[in-house]
Amino acid sequence: MEIKEISVPQQGVVADYMNGKKEIQSCFDYMLTEDAFKQRLHDLREREFFRQDLVAHLLEYNTKLQAGESTLQNVKALGDENTYVVIAGQQAGLLTGPLYTIHKVISILQLAKEKEESLGVKVVPVFWIAGEDHDMDEINHTFVAKNKKMKKTIFYDRNPKKASASESELSVEDCRNWIEEIFKTYPETNFTKDVLKFVDDALKKSNTYVDFFAHLITKIFANSGLILVDSHHPELRKLEIPFFKRIISKYKEVQEGLRNQQEVIKELGYKPIIETKSHAVHIFMEIDNERVLLEDQQGKFVGKDGAHSFSYEELIEEMERNPARFSNNVVTRPLMQEYVFPTLAFIGGPGELAYWSELQQVFHTVGFQMPPVVPRLTITYVERDIATDLFDLQLRESDPFLNDVDKLRENWLSNQIEEPIDDHFEKAKKEIADIHTSLQRFVKKIEPGLGAFAGKNELKINEQIELLERMLKRNVEKKYEVQLNKFRRIQFALRPLGAPQERVWNVCYYLNQFGLDFVDRVMENSFSWDGKHHVIKL
């Protein structure tokens, strides 16, 4: 593997944050300097965490996942007051979801290792599975290349319900059939059978979406020391109840902190992305087997548009009696993460970084400092045949990342033709239009009743001109079919659907192409944290 870095233009909060713009950096409590990480350690040492209870739960959970010894040792290390975590999170996507989930894990593993060495303290990697999430449309699909198109392949659950991913049962046989259909779109390789067995072994141990995700991630990163946590696990929820109570007692201040921070963001010229109802309590409650967001209504906590109503005392009692009924929303999830883990750094994608910039005053409301927020590593893989296509078309490796591939294709095609087709036909259409306008005036002058017919005549002529243009372009494209297919392959591989590769392709494609140790070999590379995009030639 050969790794290269390229500067890809970014926009909004992420671009300004990475470029060191002070105005947006003031929306975060720590800069990304070594001194700031030392200050973070100092601040964490002044807080108390329920380490032993957390260790007991994480040991049980990761042992059930058959995690490696290095993971279990890292869990035990969390019992020491001088151990800290680098953390990231994601929904439990089928087959682990898009590649960026894998890249988040790689990011926390690398940063944890680096900070352990530079700060001289134990730093362990933790991945927070958003098991409470109930938006199945976000996790029930993957993309494949089929019939010369990128297609979204959805797993249709037989019994869909608005339950969390941790509680949504997975039909193993149906999912197995869905996975087999996906693998049929991949080339048959020496690794295909092993990868299918690898995936099926994880599937057979799974009852829910989160189970399947957790087993796969555990197997892919078997020797890395990665700790997994299911944010909706009932045993973890018991440990979180004191903080749920704090949120309930301060929900108005939380909402006010969010609104005030969003005003700051607006004044800086950015558009807030967190949308909440004005009376939101920012906590979900399970009602009739569905996650329902609680709202404040005249001093009562209500759900389902007032169909269910609780007093403060009733809600607190229910939390103590049945903690598994409660979960966080987008605003309180980062707060709960901060409550549970001694977080040295949080790693997030561009969208997460933007929405965390809206949470600073929310953190302060509950007495926390926002942890250092580190943008995750971004990676694209370039297979050998794609590198050859780029070379054959005389494109630079950076071209597909800095330009629209369709535009590159159009420019290349126009360069193969002495005179631009579009320009020639536009000129012809204009000249014909001028002639026909004069002709229509003459016809109307002689016989006004033929005016409408003359207009239709012009339309028919234009239709024929456009037909000729399409036929000419089709013939030219057929002439350069080999080269244009290279552009199509480049688009599918590097910018599928016009998006970054890591937002569309799934890791199973690369495991199938390069073997089960593919991710291990990727992690042997050294990555920088300067915001540049990492291009890995395979």
Curated annotation (Swiss-Prot):
Highest taxon, organism lineage: Bacteria
GO molecular function, one term: ligase activity
Keyword Cell division appears in the UniProt entry: no
Record keywords, A-Z: Coiled coil, Ligase
Cited InterPro entries: Bacillithiol_biosynth_BshC, CC_BshC, Rossmann-like_BshC
Coiled-coil segments on the chain, per record: 248-268
KW Coiled coil (keyword) present: yes
EC numbers: 6.-.-.-
Family membership noted in the UniProt record: Belongs to the BshC family.
Function: Involved in bacillithiol (BSH) biosynthesis. May catalyze the last step of the pathway, the addition of cysteine to glucosamine malate (GlcN-Mal) to generate BSH.
Record protein name field: Putative cysteine ligase BshC
Gene name as annotated: bshC
